[in-house]
């Protein structure tokens, strides 16, 4: 079955580029006053992350923030997330800034309902297959994974496919993540450790707190909530 086993990698370090199309996102989030603020919004915000992991566990964190021109305004969500996943135990410890507070979420891995497709794409030199995922039946994601990397992870809380996710698109968030560099030799696995600081919580309790904050924000609050589902 694995005639060319050396091409299957059990550990990896990946650099991801995250792009948020800010004007498109804000047009949906704040349609009532978008025309007033659109000229002060950047067209897009580009930030960078690293994923380090093996078949047992992984860490995902930001390495470079988006650079926004001084005369522009953009307050990203999820930019400070640090996601530690334990695939063996099916657990996650995620540091997640929410409003003025930082949560430390200790919970089971995010439940994602996947549908595999026959579509393919090459990303960072790897042949990838497309899958469509649904998180909490509220947020659809499009993922491209390669079975040459044996880790079932991806950017943010994405996991559960038969290979590593190298490309991710979330239409409702007007955001995408794509691998720009993949290293499979000398992977620094000793650095895979969960965060320890933050308000200890579960995913459900954190979302309940967020709902309480956003309950009077109307349509904007409902749309904003989706940014914290991933």
Where are these regions (language model features)?
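Sec/Tat signal peptide C-region and signal peptidase I cleavage site
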Residues: 2-5
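Extended soluble regions of mature proteins
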Residues: 7-230
């Amino acid at each position: 079955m694995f005639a060319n086993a050396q091409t299957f990698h059990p550990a990896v370090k990946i650099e991801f580029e995250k792009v948020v199309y800010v004007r498109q996102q804000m047009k949906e989030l704040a349609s009532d006053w978008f025309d007033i603020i659109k000229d002060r919004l950047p067209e897009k915000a580009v930030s960078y992350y690293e994923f380090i992991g093996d078949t047992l566990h992984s860490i995902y964190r930001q390495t470079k923030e988006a650079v926004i021109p001084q005369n522009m305004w953009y307050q990203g969500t999820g930019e400070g997330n640090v996601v530690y996943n334990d695939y063996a135990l099916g657990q996650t410890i995620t540091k997640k800034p929410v409003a003025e507070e930082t949560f430390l979420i200790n919970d089971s891995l995010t439940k994602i309902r996947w549908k595999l497709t026959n579509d393919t794409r090459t990303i960072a030199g790897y042949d990838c297959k497309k899958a469509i995922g649904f998180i909490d039946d509220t947020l659809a994601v499009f993922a491209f994974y390669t079975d040459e990397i044996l880790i079932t992870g991806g950017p943010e809380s994405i996991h559960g496919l038969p290979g590593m996710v190298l490309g991710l698109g979330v239409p409702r968030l007007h955001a995408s993540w794509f691998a720009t560099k993949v290293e499979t030799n000398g992977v620094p696995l000793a650095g895979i450790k969960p965060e320890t600081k933050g308000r200890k919580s579960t995913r459900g309790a954190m979302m309940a707190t967020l709902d309480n904050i956003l309950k009077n924000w109307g349509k904007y609050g409902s749309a904003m909530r989706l940014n914290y589902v991933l």
